Amino acid sequence: MMTKAPATAVYDTLSLLFDFPNQEQRLWWHSIAPMFAAMLDTAGHNVHDQYRHLGIFKKHIIPFLGVYPAQGKHTWPSVLTRYGIPFELSLNCLDSVVRYTFEPTTEHTGTGDDSYNAFAILECIQKLVRIQPGIDMEWFSYFRNELVLNATESARLGRNDSVNQQPIRTQNKLALDLKGDRFALKVYLYPHLKSIATGVSSHDLIFNSVRKLSQKHTSIQPSFNVLCDYVASRNDPDSNAAEAEAGVPASALRARLLSCDLVDPSKSRIKIYLLEQTVSLTAMEDLWTLGGRRTDSSTLNGLDMMRELWHLLQIPSGFMKYPESDLKLGEVPDEQLPSMVHYALHPDQPMPEPQVYFTVFGMSDAGITNALATFFSRHGWYEMAKKYRVFLEGSFPNHDFESLNYLHTYVSFSYRKNKPYLSVYLHSFETGQWPAFSDDPTAFNAFKRCDLSLT
């Protein structure tokens, strides 16, 4: 009887074959690739696709991850994770789609040649365009011009010493959605530095850029106008005053970032991400229905599932803020972050589509895993209910899984065309049998099983 190959078999084989030009790239490979390989296997990718996607990761992505983070090393601080690590894996559990997101950097990032990391992404995309047909740069070029620092603004900020102390210096990041042997590329843009340089809020920069684009691409106007109306109602001073009188902190919705698909604009989605500081089921319900503007049967069916997921995850309610600084590598989190939502604007659709993000970072990973397994089983996704914990524990085999609280960052949920979508966003650093070699730096060792016997 044939036995199934281990989930990391492709990683093990490639590790025997690959050479690396430097120690930094070798560390990135062995830190991320075990979990990446296991996720591809969990999502049902065949072995040929696994080799292709891991090969692309090694050849075209790792060179743009920069200095490998370790205690005492200076690295570019990425907003992508609370630890400043510029890479994150995510898994759409119900559609079996693997995604990875990263902030490209080069040796010029943070120097006079590219003080605020505006150009590394262009070099990275040029590499990816050569191996994947269908990548379209029109909307990326437009939003980059609207939301990323230009040369004049960069020079102005360079004379402001306080900018280097900003918690957000990320301006852009890329994501690859892996489908079969292909990938779809999308870009995320953070206008925080542009806001400092221009004096215009990130929120207004994002909404103004989409408003201007909608004058040319009128097919996105209907859904964008609905979103503007909802956000304006949430940000109305009279509404906030009423909340304050009731003893509830005012919770305006503020845009944090924007993303778009790098495909033909007629098929691309624009996504506007907003922070919700009031963490509660009532707030999530309001985000889901756009304050009662979405009332169709599909929305209401999704609302029931979203409520169920909220109760299973047991997220504490309250008014949350982002901390001023990143966590140190290996630091065990003791914090709760705001919720988030993105609204997708599709051409020729009357309503924006919501995807809500349950921010579970800092909560028990075992508890989240059990909640997700229950949710999967209740709705007939028995295979994922069986596989998910096995995959996650196997990605951190030397840790006391019951003690961990930093593996899950978000659980996202959406409901489109009468179908639910649930994704998990995961800590993707020092995975597998880390350290791969005895002299590799180890930051996340607080709950390594080998340490427990010493306490």
UniProtKB/Swiss-Prot annotation:
For this chain, one GO molecular function annotation is: tryptophan dimethylallyltransferase activity
Protein name, UniProt field: Tryptophan dimethylallyltransferase
Organism in which the protein naturally occurs: Claviceps fusiformis (Ergot fungus)
Query: What is this enzyme's EC?
Result: 2.5.1.34
Domain of life the protein comes from: Eukaryota
Q: Which family does it belong to?
A: Belongs to the tryptophan dimethylallyltransferase family.
What reaction does this enzyme carry out catalytically? L-tryptophan + dimethylallyl diphosphate = 4-(3-methylbut-2-enyl)-L-tryptophan + diphosphate
Record keyword Phosphoprotein present: no
The residues that hold L-tryptophan are: V79, L80, E88, Y190, R256
Entries under CDD domains matching the protein:
PT-DMATS_CymD
Assembly and interactions? Homodimer.
- Which residues make up the binding site for substrate? R99, K186, Y188, R269, K271, Y273, Q355, Y357, Y421, Y425
Write out the entry's keywords from A to Z: Alkaloid metabolism, Transferase
Task: Name the Pfam families for this protein.
Answer: Trp_DMAT
Instruction: Please indicate if the UniProt record lists Transferase as a keyword.
Output: yes
What does the protein in this record do?
Answer: Tryptophan dimethylallyltransferase; part of the gene cluster that mediates the biosynthesis of fungal ergot alkaloid. DmaW catalyzes the first step of ergot alkaloid biosynthesis by condensing dimethylallyl diphosphate (DMAP) and tryptophan to form 4-dimethylallyl-L-tryptophan. The second step is catalyzed by the methyltransferase easF that methylates 4-dimethylallyl-L-tryptophan in the presence of S-adenosyl-L-methionine, resulting in the formation of 4-dimethylallyl-L-abrine.
The UniProt gene name for this protein comes to dmaW
| InterPro entries referenced in this protein's UniProt entry, alphabetically | Aro_prenylTrfase, Aro_prenylTrfase_DMATS, DMATS-type_fun, Trp_dimethylallylTrfase
Q: What class of enzyme is it?
A: transferase
Q: Tell me the pathway.
A: Alkaloid biosynthesis; ergot alkaloid biosynthesis
**Would you kindly state one Gene Ontology biological process term found in this protein's UniProt entry?**
ergot alkaloid biosynthetic process
